[in-house]
């Protein structure tokens, strides 16, 4: 089926419309062929004359045309002419080889002007008379009477309503007068040009690329017109179209006037003839010129200008139709010459639709602009700047407009309210706005909404944009936060979108790719603002309707000056004025009604006149404010009674809501509104009594002081209002019976055309109005009045309630938003992370859109959109998705706990810089100065641990990136201070540098002395308790590569492990003079992997482990008793005793698997090996597994590969805490799992553990993970580089009992080992003491 434009008329329809409008049938003549080419000398050509018309009916006058313009009766009727369909044109060119389609005679020459739009879409023909001429003769015309010249001039008259187009014939040799008759076809064509250019083709000086600017009165107008043909002379403005030999007629009272609908800022070129340029200056390449013949060169110059009062010019030609006149005119069949064909409206629409479909754009109205041309005003016309070399070019506005090129804002049909609402949803900037002491989230101001609507409908008229906004308001798409009035163009009025309260997270186009170029701008405007989405309950419900003031006219015969037959044609300015007048009348009527209603409530009208004028002006104003306080209080109570009588009670009696949830629904939606009504009804009654007691009310503060302290129900009501609104909307959308009930009640006259949400917000807004009203009363209160001291007290009490209301409603809103966010989250298959979003203290700190580049990509165009949520405990990265018409948030990566997060700045070279302060941020920003601005600003997030990852995100502005870093850093600092149960105290720093790393530590002498085992030997230093002083260590032993060190102070023995050899050394020799100390330590055991010291069977035992992949040998040593008494021995006996072996071997065990740890139980040893924990008896050396194989809940341990048992701790109640390299759990003394719900998966890969009840510390190279042993909650994380445990603080062999660790820090030239001690804070120690007492 052929394409048909919806506005196009069929053949029969077009003929009937033509006959109805112009009073004569439309005639079509067959095309005739001619042989005379265009722009040649007149030559006798044989042609077949046109047959006479078979029917000639009197034509009705044109609409709004003056009767004085009809042809005089004395003038013979002109032969009929014919007009074909209008064609859009763009470029104006001459074709030397273009044949004329007219026959020529002695008095006529046909000059075609081909106007093209990339395709050959028609021609403009002008008839030239070779004998007559105007009195004005071009000075540049050649002295040849047979050289015709066609010039389009502008009259120099002062009439502001001029049509700038007319044709004059010039000749130097002829002086014949010019006929006053005007060819009607040419008049129709020029009129069509006028209205088309005037309507669609305006150049705004603010658009440097020639972007079209629509008229503010009629933004969308059809460019097609059909006018009748006649030979009568007509005058357009002060311009005359002439043919024949009569003088021209110049009239300023013509009905063909130029409407004032052209943008005043428009500019237009003036195209001069070749002869007007100096000899040394070449004309523009595309100036209109007649092609020069061999003997008779002709000049053709066309001037385009407009009335001087408007300074409007026409920037292009949109639609021309073929114009024919003269008795010898013949038609040429378009099949014979495809370059000179003209199409009807439907054919052109078809070509345009096909072209736009190929380009992949939505079919739109076609318009053309004259771009890249500069002009200046001179007198009554715009004179072209001769210095400019830019030539006028008619180009398509869709191609030349910078808006179209960048596609930052799509153009929509502004008459469709659904399109306007969708665009408004995308462009609005939402945020938290405070009004009357109340904070409204996801709100916007009225003037902002009007400004956005102006950009959407492309108008500079704020009143028109306000009308469109009120059309959306009428369908409840937007509403005032207090539901008091409609949309107003004011920054003081606050509004919200429908359902914004429970749709706070997504935006309608959040899932758009960065390839959508308008998305980049939106991100720049909304980096930190709240973004909304369609309702999570279903599809977005946009308003439906047509805003008739912005609609197009669908009649193809409609023109600017001649509106079509429809009474609702948008071109009828009179109708628009009537509509606006009606609206103004309605507004004035409604405002007058409101004024009358207000007059009845004024104090001056409620008391006798003599009393009203007996008081001073100040007191009169005070009484007016007091009267307003009293009657508004009564109105507030009536509103609450309306809720009770028309909503609550009918709902209890109705069956529209199921009985099982009716009570819960009513309590959730209406909350304690009846409690508020009970409190305020007593207040209103007391105020009314005071008012009735005396016409002049002396004071009211004492009444408020009595009732305001009872405003506690307002707090509970405000906290649950958001949930009530959500339940109401949810029930209304899912329950048709309830929806009908709501509709019926809201239509009652008692509702005053206000929906239920407007009444539900009354209590909170009323509480916020009390301070404003009372401050107004206080303003006009004299000093001696008791209200002068009492009113401030009342205001302070009310503001205290307002502060509590804001806090509670903020908590409720945060909890509500987290609840819906938790419902929207979607995890990858097989993954689920419990973010504890429903916890009572959980908070959403910050949220916003960011960019993420795909792996391996360096182009910013390949970035994708993600949304980042910052909670009080974690970061969440999601991708918005729409699945089954439901907005969901797909979790992009594993949530990052803030305790395990590391922030990095990324410089221009891609290097990561750890973020720790604002100074570093300032340094990076300073380094970026002087370089071209970047499109995106990156920062990097790193998750520590075994399952960690790193991701780089990009903000669109530097301010946005800095804000993200600031929020994350502040929340991390707050969280660390809140959960800092351990404090890290530096013991030694800036001493062990380079390769001399600290690997072990020993404490003795009640913690006053420390021994450091390093790669170069053993160092000793002093230490003062609870003192930040650091003492310089001194080398005591020159034994290299010490990996383990233990001090057995009871036996005055030091054990060292160096290069897998276990040594012993007398402890007292460390304190002696280095000259008396023995040179070498005593060897205890070789090929030792590690050793452990502990208490078993009531004895101090030393276990030296020699481990390999297939087996492990454990030697059990016991210190010699006499060795510990050498301190008090005489020197000789002491010397002999020292030479004895300090350790004697007790047992030697063999285990057929690799061993990783040894632990001491009460009577047995527990060895950690690849098979798990094995219990070994020292009596009979029997070995058995600690875990009972009968417990099937422990099968995961046996099936898990590459899991190492590292530590075991005895807990209260006979339980054991087993710590592996990946997880931890509890078992009882029988080897069965004791706490099924307690299970810890370590974030990192721990290598050592330490217990400081009630906390377990897991040490891995990059951080220390601290968890609570009862709740398994992650309490604290201490990060560092190359962290290693030095002493776990277990037992009381040494008096220290502290936990020591070492880490590396980067110095100026090398790395330094820093030794730290972990201690419980005072609060944690106090909590631990209380737990022990229990």
Swiss-Prot record:
The keyword ATP-binding does not apply. GO terms for molecular function: guanyl-nucleotide exchange factor activity; phosphatidylinositol-4-phosphate binding. Its main location: cytoplasm. One of its GO terms (cellular component) is nucleus. Residues 995-1293 form the CNH domain. CDD domains: DEP_fRom2, RhoGEF. InterPro entries: CNH_dom, DBL_dom_sf, DEP_dom, DH_dom, PH-like_dom_sf, PH_5, PH_domain, Rho-type_GEFs. It comes from the Eukaryota. The keyword Phosphoprotein applies. Residues 843-973 form the PH domain. Residues 1-89, 135-182, 203-245, 381-402 are annotated as: Disordered. Residues 150-164, 213-227, 234-245, 381-400 have a biased composition (Polar residues). GO terms for biological process: cell growth mode switching, monopolar to bipolar; cortical actin cytoskeleton organization; division septum assembly; establishment or maintenance of bipolar cell polarity; fungal-type cell wall biogenesis; positive regulation of cell integrity MAPK cascade; regulation of cell wall (1->3)-beta-D-glucan biosynthetic process; regulation of cell wall organization or biogenesis. Keywords: Cell cycle, Cell division, Cytoplasm, Guanine-nucleotide releasing factor, Phosphoprotein, Septation. This is Rho1 guanine nucleotide exchange factor 1. It comes from Schizosaccharomyces pombe (strain 972 / ATCC 24843).
């Amino acid at each position: 089926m052929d394409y048909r434009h919806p506005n196009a008329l069929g053949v029969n329809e077009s003929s009937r419309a033509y006959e109805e409008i112009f009073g004569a049938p439309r005639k079509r003549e067959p095309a005739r062929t001619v042989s005379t080419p265009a722009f040649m000398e007149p030559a006798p050509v044989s042609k077949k004359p046109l047959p006479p018309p078979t029917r000639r009916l009197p034509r009705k006058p044109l609409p709004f045309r003056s009767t004085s313009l009809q042809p005089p009766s004395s003038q013979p009727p002109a032969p009929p002419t014919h007009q074909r369909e209008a064609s859009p044109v763009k470029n104006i060119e001459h074709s030397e080889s273009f044949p004329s389609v007219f026959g020529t005679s002695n008095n006529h020459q046909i000059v075609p002007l081909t106007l093209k739009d990339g395709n050959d879409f028609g021609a403009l023909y002008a008839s030239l008379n070779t004998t007559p001429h105007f009195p004005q003769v071009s000075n540049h015309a050649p002295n040849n009477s047979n050289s015709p010249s066609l010039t389009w001039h502008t009259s120099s008259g002062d009439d502001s309503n001029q049509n700038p187009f007319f044709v004059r014939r010039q000749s130097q040799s002829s002086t014949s007068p010019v006929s006053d008759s005007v060819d009607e076809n040419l008049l129709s064509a020029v009129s069509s040009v006028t209205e088309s250019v005037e309507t669609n083709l305006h150049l705004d000086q603010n658009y440097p690329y020639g972007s079209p600017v629509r008229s503010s009165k009629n933004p969308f107008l059809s460019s097609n017109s059909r006018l009748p043909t006649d030979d009568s002379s007509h005058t357009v403005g002060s311009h005359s179209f002439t043919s024949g030999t009569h003088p021209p007629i110049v009239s300023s009272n013509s009905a063909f006037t130029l409407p004032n609908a052209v943008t005043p800022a428009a500019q237009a070129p003036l195209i001069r003839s070749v002869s007007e340029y100096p000899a040394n200056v070449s004309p523009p390449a595309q100036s209109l010129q007649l092609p020069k013949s061999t003997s008779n060169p002709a000049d053709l110059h066309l001037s385009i200008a407009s009335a001087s009062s408007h300074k409007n010019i026409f920037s292009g030609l949109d639609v021309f139709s073929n114009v024919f006149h003269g008795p010898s005119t013949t038609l040429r069949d378009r099949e014979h010459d495809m370059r000179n064909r003209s199409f009807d409206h439907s054919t052109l629409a078809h070509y345009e639709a096909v072209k736009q479909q190929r380009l992949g754009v939505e079919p739109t109205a076609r318009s053309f602009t004259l771009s890249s041309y500069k002009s200046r005003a001179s007198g009554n016309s715009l004179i072209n700047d001769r210095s400019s070399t830019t030539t006028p070019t008619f180009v398509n506005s869709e191609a030349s407009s910078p808006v179209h090129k960048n596609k930052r804002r799509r153009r929509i049909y502004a008459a469709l309210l659904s399109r306007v609402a969708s665009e408004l949803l995308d462009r609005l900037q939402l945020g938290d706005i405070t009004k009357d002491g109340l904070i409204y989230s996801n709100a916007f101001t009225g003037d902002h909404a009007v400004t956005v609507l102006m950009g959407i409908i492309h108008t500079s008229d704020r009143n028109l944009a306000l009308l469109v906004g009120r059309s959306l308001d009428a369908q409840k798409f937007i509403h005032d936060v207090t539901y008091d009035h409609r949309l107003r163009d004011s920054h003081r009025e606050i509004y919200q979108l429908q359902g914004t309260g429970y749709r706070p997270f997504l935006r309608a186009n959040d899932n758009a790719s960065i390839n959508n170029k308008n998305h980049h701008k939106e991100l720049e405007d909304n980096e930190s603002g709240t973004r909304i989405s369609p309702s999570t309950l279903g599809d977005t419900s946009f308003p439906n309707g047509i805003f008739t003031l912005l609609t197009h006219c669908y009649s193809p015969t409609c023109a600017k000056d001649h509106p079509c037959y429809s009474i609702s044609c948008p071109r009828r300015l009179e109708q628009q004025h009537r509509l606006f007048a009606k609206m103004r009348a309605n507004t004035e009527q409604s405002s007058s009604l409101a004024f009358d209603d207000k007059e009845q409530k004024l104090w001056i009208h409620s008391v006798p006149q003599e009393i009203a004028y007996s008081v001073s002006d100040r007191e009169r104003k005070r009484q007016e404010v007091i009267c307003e306080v009293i009657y508004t209080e009564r109105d507030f109570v009536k509103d609450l009674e309306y809720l009770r009588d028309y909503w609550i009670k009918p709902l209890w009696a109705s069956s529209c809501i199921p009985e099982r949830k009716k009570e819960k629904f009513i309590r959730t939606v209406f909350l304690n509104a009846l409690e508020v009504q009970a409190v305020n009804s007593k207040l209103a009654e007391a105020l009314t009594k005071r008012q009735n007691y005396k016409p002049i009310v002396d004071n009211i503060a004492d009444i408020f002081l009595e009732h305001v302290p009872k405003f506690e129900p307002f707090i509970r009501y405000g906290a649950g209002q958001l949930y009530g609104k959500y339940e109401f909307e949810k029930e209304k959308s899912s329950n048709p019976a309830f929806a009908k009930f709501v509709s019926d009640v809201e239509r009652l006259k008692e509702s005053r055309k206000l929906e239920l949400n407007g009444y539900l917000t009354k209590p909170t807004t009323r509480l916020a109005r009390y301070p404003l009203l009372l401050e107004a009363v206080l303003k006009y209160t004299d000093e001696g009045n008791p209200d002068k001291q009492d009113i401030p007290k009342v205001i302070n009490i009310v503001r205290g309630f307002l502060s509590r209301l804001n806090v509670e409603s903020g908590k409720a809103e945060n909890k509500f938003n987290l609840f819906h966010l938790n419902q929207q989250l979607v995890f990858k298959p097989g993954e689920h992370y419990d973010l504890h979003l429903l916890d009572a203290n959980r908070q959403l700190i910050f949220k916003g859109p960011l960019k993420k580049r795909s792996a391996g990509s360096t182009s910013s165009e390949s970035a994708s959109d993600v949304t980042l949520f910052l909670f009080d405990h974690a970061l969440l990265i999601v991708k918005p998705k729409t699945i089954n018409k439901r907005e969901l948030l797909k979790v992009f990566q594993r949530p990052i706990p803030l305790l395990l997060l590391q922030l990095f700045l990324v410089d221009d070279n891609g290097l990561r810089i750890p973020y720790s302060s604002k100074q570093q941020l300032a340094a990076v920003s300073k380094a970026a100065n002087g370089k071209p601005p970047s499109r995106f600003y990156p920062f990097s997030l790193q998750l520590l641990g075994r399952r960690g990852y790193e991701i780089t995100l990009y903000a669109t502005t530097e301010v946005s990136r800095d804000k993200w870093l600031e929020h994350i850093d502040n929340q991390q600092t707050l969280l660390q201070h809140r959960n800092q149960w351990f404090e890290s105290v530096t013991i030694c720093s800036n001493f062990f540098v380079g390769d001399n790393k600290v690997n072990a530590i020993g404490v003795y002498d009640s913690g006053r002395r420390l021994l450091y085992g390093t790669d170069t030997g053993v160092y000793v230093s002093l230490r003062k308790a609870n003192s930040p002083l650091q003492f310089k260590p001194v080398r005591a032993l020159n034994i290299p590569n010490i990996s383990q060190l233990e001090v057995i102070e009871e036996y005055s023995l030091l054990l060292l492990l160096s290069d897998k050899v276990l040594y012993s050394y007398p402890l007292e020799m460390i304190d002696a003079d280095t000259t008396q100390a023995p040179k070498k330590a005593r060897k205890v055991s070789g090929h030792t992997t590690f050793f452990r010291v502990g208490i078993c069977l009531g004895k101090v035992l030393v276990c030296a482990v020699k481990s390999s992949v297939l087996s492990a040998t454990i030697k059990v040593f016991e210190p010699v008793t006499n060795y510990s008494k050498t301190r008090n021995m005489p020197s000789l006996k002491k010397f002999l005793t020292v030479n004895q072996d300090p350790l004697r071997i007790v047992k030697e065990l063999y285990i057929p698997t690799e061993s990783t740890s040894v632990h001491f139980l009460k009577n047995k040893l527990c060895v950690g090996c690849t098979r798990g924990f094995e219990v070994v008896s020292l009596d009979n050396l029997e070995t058995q597994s600690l875990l009972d194989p009968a417990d099937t809940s422990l099968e995961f341990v046996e099936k898990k590969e590459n899991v190492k048992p590292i530590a075991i701790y005895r807990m209260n109640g006979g339980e054991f805490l087993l710590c592996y390299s990946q997880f931890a759990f509890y078992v009882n003394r029988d080897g069965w799992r004791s706490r099924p719900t307690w299970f810890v998966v370590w974030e990192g890969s721990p290598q050592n553990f330490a217990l400081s009840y009630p906390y377990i510390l897991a040490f891995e190279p990059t951080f220390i993970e601290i968890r609570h042993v009862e709740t398994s909650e992650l309490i604290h994380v201490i990060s560092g580089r190359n962290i290693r445990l030095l002493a776990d603080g277990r037992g009381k062999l040494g008096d220290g009992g502290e936990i020591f660790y070492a880490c590396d820090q980067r110095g100026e030239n090398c790395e330094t080992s820093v030794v730290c001690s972990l201690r419980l804070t005072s609060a944690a120690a106090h909590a631990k003491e209380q737990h022990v007492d229990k």
